[in-house]
UniProtKB/Swiss-Prot annotation:
Quaternary structure and interacting proteins, as annotated: Homodimer.
One GO location term (cellular component): cytosol
Protein's name according to its UniProt entry: Glucose-6-phosphate isomerase
InterPro entries: G6P_Isomerase (IPR001672), G6P_Isomerase_C (IPR023096), Phosphoglucose_isomerase_CS (IPR018189), SIS_dom_sf (IPR046348), SIS_PGI_1 (IPR035476), SIS_PGI_2 (IPR035482)
Length: 550
């Protein structure tokens, strides 16, 4: 059905009624006490991976839901036409209507032989051509066949990009560090703050450094400024501009700007305008990943995501893991009033995973206007944040356990560690904390339990835990290229489903434009003499302080 505001859908109103009569009164420990099979009812296993990579368990049982809750939320998804929008996406329709573009990143990881068409054209031959180019290049660099201008093999790779051209490659190369080539050192430069580039270059030798300049348009201000400074640093040693060709490659679609920079068109890795930045790690933007972990592992990374795509498209909503996770998230944000969502990976290699998911979720669904142009009257775009466990337990978990805010959480851990130190003792301790935290959040601790420990009466309230705090538990067999690909795709489809229900366009990002435009005006003023007076008094004061100093 066609609709503007999700809140006008009959199913939304049914969920609201259910929340008032049932949802807000649910007590998790009572639900578990009444139903010994609750874990089985609300846990789902993703079996789409090879034996060495999977399966992945998703346990939703520690959520403030009943079977009726799920039924009503699924009806909401159906009324909001989640399945129809999903099918339109995979059909190559221009569902990013504000930019008149298809949303076709699943084609980048389509490891099947099936064609995928946009505007009547099968895009797969072009996708495979770029992948072959990535394979040839990464194989040459990793083997030492690709030489720098003095004949030495590459030892350092510097990826220069920002946003999706940085967050994805950073996160994936960190997450898959056990698969990385030890004689290759990776650096990522994103911030326009000169410190970021300077610190990376301190560790590099111009003769053995390869720069990947990652910018779709090759006009992004931060990336182009960093790239020019990197080239200046390189030429200070190499002297001859022709040597740039051996040390700089471009991940871009703008051949004119790329060649003007001095990069050979043969060393340009293309991707299409239907690839959004936050979905671009699967594209040529993932070249740093392929260079570091090897093309075969990069291909496994793609295949894991493809397996989740196939699952999302073929599984009924009632049992569809990403769809259910999204609907439960909507249940908290729009009916319980939760504003944030915690992601706590109990795996040190995944320390950048929450930052990656921040962009995926918040840039996609940080919108207040529906697809039909109306202002929403409900909550969209949860604030997603997190840090790895167990570090996070010693910082912000206090607020989650005893604070005033409801903070739904995802806890993520692999069963197998890449580093089973001390006969796996470290990992057993890690898992014990993982399991205990979800249990503690659910159970809490009553005043009677605190008092029974001999706590003085006046201290009892301070040691009481309300409990009834919801969480999802996600347990992978092991973090491998394929399982990581599947997990990222899972969160992509969670984000998609949320946006579909809220009826917003999850695929543009006009919110990042205004500040960039104003920054150009401010920069021009910083490069002229005299005080500025054409802003508000605060902005004038800040600019003039920078120009004149204290």
């Amino acid at each position: 059905m066609s609709f503007s505001l999700a809140s006008t859908l009959p199913a939304w109103q049914a969920v609201q009624t259910h929340y008032e009569s049932v949802g807000k009164h649910l007590v998790l420990k009572e639900l578990f006490a009444k139903d010994s099979s609750r874990f089985e009812k609300f846990s789902f296993t993703f079996n789409g991976l090879k034996e060495e990579d999977g399966p992945i368990l998703f346990d939703f049982s520690k959520n403030l839901i009943t079977e009726e809750t799920v039924e009503l939320l699924v009806k909401l998804a159906k009324e909001a036409n989640v399945e129809g929008l999903r099918d339109a996406l995979f059909a190559g329709e221009h569902i990013n209507f504000t930019e008149d573009r298809a949303v076709f990143h699943p084609a980048l990881r389509n490891v099947s032989e099936k064609p995928m068409k946009v505007n009547g054209q099968d895009v797969m031959p072009g996708v495979r051509k770029v992948l072959r180019h990535m394979k040839e290049f990464s194989d040459a660099v990793r083997s030492g066949a690709w030489k720098g201008y003095t004949g030495k093999p590459i030892k350092s790779i510097v990826n220069v990009g920002i946003g999706g051209s940085d967050l994805g490659p950073v996160m994936v190369t960190e997450a898959l560090k056990p698969y990385g080539q030890e004689n290759l050192e990776l650096h990522f430069v994103s911030n326009i703050d000169g410190t970021h580039l300077a610190e990376a270059l301190k560790k590099c030798d111009p003769e053995t450094t390869l720069f990947l300049i990652a910018s779709k348009t090759f006009t992004t201000a931060e990336t182009c400024t960093n790239a020019k400074s990197a080239k200046d640093w390189f030429l200070a040693s190499a002297k001859d501009p022709s040597h740039v060709a051996k040390h700089f490659v471009a991940l871009s679609t703008n051949e004119k700007e790329v060649t003007a920079f001095g990069i050979s068109a043969q060393n340009m890795f293309e991707f299409s305008d239907w690839v959004g930045g936050r979905y671009s790690v699967w594209s040529a933007i993932g070249l740093s990943v392929a260079l570091y972990i090897g093309y075969e592992n990069f291909e496994a990374f793609l295949s894991g995501a493809h397996a989740m795509d196939e699952y999302f498209c073929s599984t009924p909503l009632e049992k569809n893991i990403p769809a259910l996770a999204a609907l439960i998230s909507i249940w908290y944000s729009d009916f319980f009033g939760a504003q944030t969502h915690l992601v706590a990976p109990y795996d040190q290699y995944l320390h950048r995973f929450p930052a990656y998911l921040q962009q995926l979720s918040m840039e996609s669904n940080g919108k207040a206007i529906t697809r039909s142009g109306d202002m929403v009257n409900y909550t969209t775009g949860k604030i997603l944040w997190g840090e790895p466990g167990t570090n996070s337990q010693h910082s912000f978990f206090q607020l989650i356990h005893q604070g005033t805010k409801l903070i739904p959480a995802d806890f993520l851990i692999p069963i197998e560690s890449h580093n089973p130190i001390d006969n796996n003792k470290h990992h057993r301790m890690l898992f014990s904390n993982f399991a205990a935290q979800t249990e503690a959040l659910m159970l809490g601790k009553t005043p009677a339990e605190v008092k029974a420990e001999g706590t003085p009466d006046e201290i009892v309230p301070h040691k009481t835990f309300v409990g009834n705090r919801p969480s999802n538990s996600i347990i992978a067999k092991k973090i491998t290229p394929a399982s990581l690909g599947a997990l990222i795709a899972f969160y992509e489809w969670v984000t998609f489903t949320e946006g579909a229900v809220w009826n917003i366009n999850s695929f543009d990002q006009f919110g990042v434009e205004l500040g960039k435009k104003l920054a150009k005006n401010v920069l021009a003023q910083l490069e002229t003499k005299g005080d500025v007076e054409n802003h508000d008094s605060s902005t004038n004061g800040l600019i003039n302080l920078f120009k004149n100093g204290f």
